[in-house]
Structures are given as C-alpha cells and as structure tokens.
Amino acid sequence: MATARQGENTISPEAIPSNLPSRPTVLVFDSGVGGLSVYDEIRQLLPDLHYIYAFDNEAFPYGEKSQQFIIERVVEIVNAVQLRHQLALVVIACNTASTISLPALRERFTFPVVGVVPAVKPAAKLTRNGVVGLLATRATVQRPYTHELIARFATDCQILSLGSSELVELAEAKLQGETISISELQKILRPWLRLPEPPDTVVLGCTHFPLLAEELKAALPDGTRLVDSGAAIARRTAWLIANLDNPPLSTDKNLVYCLAITPKVATLWPILQRYGFDSLEKLPL
C-alpha cells in the first residue's frame, strides 16, 4: 500500500519484483497536473512505453511568471530528469511553457522535444457558425504566438479569446476529488454565454482544461464542441518514437517527480496510481 512518510522525499508502494521489458522512456512535463490529460492520450496510443511525469508544484502556476524564469526553470527540470534517466523523448504538456521554452530545450538537448499549442487550426475547420472560442490562461491568450496561430489558421472565423486562471485551479481541485459547480463555470464563461451567437466550437488552450470537459459541456450551450491538442500530440509522439534510431531503453516502472512533497501532493497519490504510476518522488535540482 502506498504511504507518505513525513520528512521523506518519496511516496511509493511496497517493492514488487519487476519483470518489465525494456522500452523507451518518455518524460511528460507540466507546471501542474493538467499535463496528465496529454499523458493519458499518449498512453492510450502507446501503452508499452516507460513514462515519467514531472510537475513543478513549487513554482505552479506558470501563467504569471516571466519568460526568462520559465525558460530557465523548464531547462533545469528537464536536465535534472535526464541526468537520472536516459530519455528518448520529452513532451512539454503545458501551453505556457511550450510557447516560451521549446527553442531553448531543443538547443540544449539532443532528444526530440514536443510541445503543445492551442488547437486553433482544427477548431476553425469544425465550426459551423464561424465563431470559435479560445479558452486558455491569460498568459497564453496574450502571447504573440497565439495571435500568429489565429492569423495563420483562422482568418475566416471570429475568434473570441477568454483568459482564465480560475479554471486551472478548478481543474486541480477536481483531480483532488472536489465537485465543480456548473454555475461557477458559467460565471467564468459569462462573456460568451450572454452573446446572441456564442461560440459553437471551443479550443481548450490549456492542458488542465480537458480535465473539466464534462463540466464545461454542461456549462456551455448544447452542442458546443470542445477541441484540444492531446490526440495530435499523441500521434506526433508515436511517429517520433517509431522513427528514433536506437533509442535508450529502460526496465524501470512508471514514475512521477514533483518539486516538493506536500500534503496536497500526498493526496494526489491514489489518483496518480490510477494513471499507471508506481512511485512519486521529489526531484532534486
């Protein structure tokens, strides 16, 4: 049974002999637990890989942090993991970190680094009324990269952006087992809901938001389509893994790294087990 011991930096089940086959190691990173939505898509497509999930609960959330801080922090964390494990591929499952840190990561490391971007292009193709909502953090909504995506792929649509850090907190709360109020979501979505023609397609531009998909569907008008980039990231990961030349292999069990063992993290452990992880450790930087 998994236990959390005060003063220790590890949460893990009792030791069980492992006869796992050798397989490539994929690191999935996010500032919080939203990246689990991306990890879950990848794992469904590629169930036999060795997975490490790392989240920066010490500096969460990234939305209000400076670009320089995010670049240095993400590079430092990925480096700390790769010093302990031979990585075949890294997925930055955080929109904010992806739009900022990918060039630095790709310059520093030789393994492929995959990022997530708001699914503006597929949403523009799916919309029926030409009105697309972009639901993201305020930082993602404001970034030039997001504006470039819209200008490139959605010129024929009306894009209505809505930035919300509250939804990130609600997604984390849901994963902790809390019930999310639909009326609270409707207050956040009010700028869209009071329009004569609200978006019929909504881009979930933060990896936390797919965790709230059921609640968002209940809060939005009937028939609203939700679009995220998780499945596309999974397909990209599968293609890259298939085309790697002699990737490093591991027989380790799936592992989660956090930056601080806290009571909140300890309560996450049963949930992380359901996602297929076998241990949770503090990552020393």
Curated annotation (Swiss-Prot):
Question: What does the record give as its pathway?
Answer: Cell wall biogenesis; peptidoglycan biosynthesis
Q: What is this protein called?
A: Glutamate racemase
Please tell me the species this chain comes from. Answer: Pectobacterium carotovorum subsp. carotovorum (strain PC1)
* InterPro entries the record matches: Asp/Glu/hydantoin_racemase, Asp/Glu_race, Asp/Glu_racemase_AS_1, Asp/Glu_racemase_AS_2, Glu_race
Give the main EC class: isomerase
* An example Gene Ontology molecular-function term: glutamate racemase activity
Query: Known Pfam families for this protein?
Result: Asp_Glu_race
Q: Does the keyword rRNA-binding apply?
A: no
Q: What UniProt keywords apply to this chain's record, in alphabetical order?
A: Cell shape, Cell wall biogenesis/degradation, Isomerase, Peptidoglycan synthesis
